[in-house]
Amino acid sequence: MKNFILLAVSSILLVDLFPTHCGHNVDLSKAINLNGVNFNNVDASSLGAAHVGQSASRGRGLGENPDDEEGDAKKKKDGKKAEPKNPRENKLKQPGDRADGQPAGDRADGQPAGDRADGQPAGDRADGQPAGDRAAGQPAGDRADGQPAGDRADGQPAGDRADGQPAGDRADGQPAGDRAAGQPAGDRAAGQPAGDRADGQPAGDRAAGQPAGDRADGQPAGDRAAGQPAGDRADGQPAGDRAAGQPAGDRAAGQPAGDRAAGQAAGDRAAGQAAGGNAGGQGQNNEGANAPNEKSVKEYLDKVRATVGTEWTPCSVTCGVGVRVRRRVNAANKKPEDLTLNDLETDVCTMDKCAGIFNVVSNSLGLVILLVLALFN
């Protein structure tokens, strides 16, 4: 009886050492995926071949008339060849839509691809030239007199309400000007091209003195930014969105790309933590709950301070949930001893569950105990 008990226990422990082949340690998700793969990988070509063979056996090949089955008996009796009532057309229709004598003509007479054009291809209400849209005497003119591709332009091509220049949109004296006086491509700009409500510079949107400034004073591409380019309500830095002193900060004080975060980057209403949504410290929603702990980040930084760079470091744990860090771009040249939490980007990393390791250890320990009992009893 004693030997039987030892044999049973040893069998259980040996089976438990192979979790991928035994019942209680089987990963059900992998098993389900395996079954799904086996089911989804059925070769459908054999089914298609069987279907084609069945159709051929019934005389339903391509190009045959299904009504021939009912008329076979009559044909054999009469000995005459039956003529189809509606002969099939094997040729495709030409791509001409309302065109006489030419392909792909849309209401065109005598030419291809002409849309309401007389005597030329691809003319849209054009007289004597191709691709003219309400143009007289030139191709591709849209309400233009004497030039191609002019849109309400006098004397030049591609002018949209422009006088004397091509491609001018409400521009005086220059091409491609949109409500600009004296320069090309200016949108409500005075004296420069491509200026949108900008004075003295190109591509300025409500910017004074610089190009591409959107409500920015003194710099290009500034959106409500004072003194820097591309600043959105930012003071002193580029691309800052309601951020003071840093670029690309969204309601963040002192850090870039922070969303209502104080002291950290990309924090959503988080105080003292990075990327925390409505969370102070640990937080109460999913984002806050998944935010890395500041203490653990500091401890991990002390371990990898000498090797941390702009690439992600390995996870701080070998199983379970840990953290990983990397330098920000603006701190790439900092000395390792000068690094702080504000110079780092943190991320939560999840490794394999530790249950598998514990199972192997416990099973091995149980097997050792069993062997000791078997040898010394």
Curated annotation (Swiss-Prot):
Residue span of region Region I: 91-95
Propeptide span(s): 355-377
Sequence-type repeats, residues: 95-103, 104-112, 113-121, 122-130, 131-139, 140-148, 149-157, 158-166, 167-175, 176-184, 185-193, 194-202, 203-211, 212-220, 221-229, 230-238, 239-247, 248-256, 257-265, 266-274
Entry keywords, A to Z: Cell membrane, Cytoplasm, Disulfide bond, Glycoprotein, GPI-anchor, Lipoprotein, Malaria, Membrane, Repeat, Signal, Sporozoite
UniProt-annotated stretches for the region Required for the binding to heparan sulfate proteoglycans (HSPGs) on the surface of host hepatocytes: 80-88
Pfam families recorded: TSP_1
Segments of this protein annotated with the region Disordered: 51-294
Region (20 X 9 AA tandem repeats of [PA]-G-D-R-A-[DA]-G-Q-[PA]): 95-274
InterPro entries: Crcmsprzoite, TSP1_rpt, TSP1_rpt_sf
Topology of this chain in the membrane: Lipid-anchor; GPI-anchor
Entry's Gene Ontology cellular component terms: cell surface; cytoplasm; plasma membrane; side of membrane
Localization per record: Cell membrane; Cytoplasm
Domain TSP type-1: 303-355
Biased composition (Low complexity): 236-273, 284-293
Sequence ranges of Basic and acidic residues compositional bias: 72-100
Main localisation: membrane
Disulfide partners: 315-349, 319-354
Residues where lipid is bound covalently (GPI-anchor amidated cysteine): 354
Record's signal peptide: 1-22
Protein name (Swiss-Prot/TrEMBL): Circumsporozoite protein
Organism: Plasmodium vivax (strain Salvador I)
Gene (name only): CSP
